């Protein structure tokens, strides 16, 4: 890929985008991105890493072979932790038992996107991911500093502008085809300073292994699975949109929550109607392909960040991926009821059928403030009219666990301090708990965690980081899930979150 400007305005856009990235990566003559900055934000994602037997933090960093694509990454890692005695001791222990490994790159796999389409994702080597997370955190910080975009809140702002655009046509929404796969190495090299480009090249995976075993060289800077992919593409598109605005003479408007007249979240882009055509033209210049079937600048429909809007109404449907666990059924019922309330379309037969999938001893009614997967959300008046008779029924059942019966008795005879407050209501709710393993007191006992080797310093560091709680190593939420019912209280049952 080569940037090939067709007219003078293209040159202006390229210059503005480069200027934005210079501001991001330089502080005057000083470099902003270095090992000290990256190491402060070292981290690992919730997914898998190459040659790791489990998904938890302790296993990946202190109980597995440390994989990387370049030996310089391990030397940099040792430099970063040399002044951290606890981490260094944990690494020396791990290295002596598990060793290190250089791999060619990532491993490609697929996860379902729809019933017909799967999304590709790459499993990264552990050390590559550690550095990618550090770089990604730096990019997120700069994204918020320069463009006031907070990735944790931006989807709400995207939907807000999409809603407004569906009412008065003032904003258009742009969807890109395979955006992350279209960020080529040459594009990034042309836009960002050389020293920052070298950091990205060092930490990325140069190739990936297909399910067939074939090794494929990657010409994109990073894939989905790389921790800096999402903030990097958000920065590129934010820089491009703001450059287009400046050239068109459109003022950039910012509020306390972020930008008010444009929005970027990954490849979800929203711009003013009068800037739409120029932004699309510049996206093509940068090598991106606009998905015209999902991009809208005319009519009353707008789509962004999971919101489908028509004339100011959210017409997004409810998608049910699975109903294999009772928590999935709770979620389906709650989302369908919300959709019915929003659309005015009643679905009594559908909801009644889903309700029938829930066992008679698992029908927990909960307030609107709780999560969709914890029970069925109902008005307070309905809950109070059914609670006593349902709890009496549970007390008579032999198949109801004793801890649930004790919770009912506790609520009725020995209310805890919060229940003594006026208008406070006790109720039972279901939470899904992932499988966890108790840490043995010494290295002479087994843990049960696959491939577990006792590493005292690694366990302590994991505990201090919040990855070990109550002496147990917890796996991902979707691994060996089990349900835990607990007694809770609320004084704001009917309050509906915004």
Predicted regions and their residues:
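Active-site-proximal segment of RNA-dependent polymerases
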Residues: 122-174
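Nucleotide/phosphate-binding sheet-loop regions of phosphoryl- and nucleotidyl-transfer enzymes
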Residues: 91-95, 125, 129-133, 145, ...
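Short helix/loop capping segments that flank catalytic or ligand/cofactor-binding pockets
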Residues: 119-121, 131-132, 181-184, 231-232, ...
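C-terminal, non-catalytic extensions of nucleic-acid polymerases
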Residues: 1-118, 343-498
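A conserved non-catalytic segment of reverse transcriptases
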Residues: 298-342
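Conserved polymerase palm-domain catalytic core
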Residues: 166-265, 270-286, 293-308, 344-375
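Acidic/polar loop patches that form or flank catalytic/metal-binding clefts of enzymes
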Residues: 145-147, 290-294, 317
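Short, glycine-/Ser/Thr-/acidic-enriched flexible segments
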Residues: 116, 126-128, 137, 177-179, ...
């Amino acid at each position: 890929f080569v940037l090939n400007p067709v007219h003078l305005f293209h040159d202006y856009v390229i210059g503005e985008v480069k200027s934005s990235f210079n501001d991001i990566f330089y502080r005057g003559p000083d470099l902003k991105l270095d090992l000290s900055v990256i190491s402060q934000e070292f981290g690992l994602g919730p997914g898998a890493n190459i040659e790791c037997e489990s998904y938890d933090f302790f296993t990946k960093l202190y109980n597995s072979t440390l994989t990387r694509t370049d030996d310089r990454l391990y030397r940099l890692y040792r430099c970063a932790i040399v002044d951290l005695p606890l981490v260094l001791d944990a690494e020396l222990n791990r290295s002596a038992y598990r060793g290190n490994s250089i791999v060619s790159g990532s491993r490609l796999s697929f996860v379902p996107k729809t019933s017909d389409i799967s999304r590709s994702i790459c499993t990264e080597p552990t050390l590559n991911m550690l550095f990618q997370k550090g770089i990604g955190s730096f990019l997120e910080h700069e994204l918020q500093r320069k463009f006031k975009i907070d990735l944790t809140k931006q989807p709400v702002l995207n939907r807000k502008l999409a809603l407004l655009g569906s009412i008065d046509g003032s904003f258009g929404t742009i969807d890109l085809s395979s955006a992350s796969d279209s960020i080529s190495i040459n594009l990034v090299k042309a836009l960002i300073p050389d020293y920052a480009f070298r950091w990205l090249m060092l930490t990325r995976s140069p190739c990936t292994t297909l399910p067939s075993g074939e090794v494929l060289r990657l010409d994109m800077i990073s894939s989905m699975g790389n921790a800096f992919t999402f903030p990097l593409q958000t920065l590129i598109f934010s820089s491009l949109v703001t450059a287009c605005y400046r050239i068109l003479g459109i003022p950039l408007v910012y509020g306390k929550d972020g930008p008010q007249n444009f929005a970027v979240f990954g490849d979800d882009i929203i711009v003013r109607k009068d800037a739409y055509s120029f932004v699309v033209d510049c996206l093509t210049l940068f090598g991106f392909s606009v998905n015209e079937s999902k991009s809208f600048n005319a009519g009353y429909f707008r789509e962004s960040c999971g919101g489908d809007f028509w004339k100011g109404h959210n017409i997004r449907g409810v998608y049910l991926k699975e109903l294999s666990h009772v928590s999935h059924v709770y979620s389906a019922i709650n989302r369908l009821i919300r959709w019915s309330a929003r659309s005015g379309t009643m679905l009594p037969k559908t909801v009644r059928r889903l309700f029938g999938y829930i066992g008679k001893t698992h029908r927990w009614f909960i307030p609107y403030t709780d999560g969709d997967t914890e029970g069925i959300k109902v008005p307070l008046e309905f809950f109070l009219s059914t609670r006593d008779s349902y709890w009496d029924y549970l007390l008579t059942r032999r198949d109801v666990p004793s801890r649930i019966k004790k919770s009912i008795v506790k609520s009725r005879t020995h209310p805890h301090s919060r229940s003594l407050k006026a208008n406070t209501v006790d109720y039972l709710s279901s939470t899904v708990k992932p499988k966890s393993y108790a840490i043995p007191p010494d290295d002479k006992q087994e843990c049960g965690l696959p491939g577990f080797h006792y590493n005292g310093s690694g366990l302590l560091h994991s505990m201090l980081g919040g990855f070990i709680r109550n002496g147990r190593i917890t796996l991902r939420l979707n691994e060996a899930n089990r349900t835990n019912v607990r007694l809770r209280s609320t004084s704001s049952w009917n309050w509906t979150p915004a």
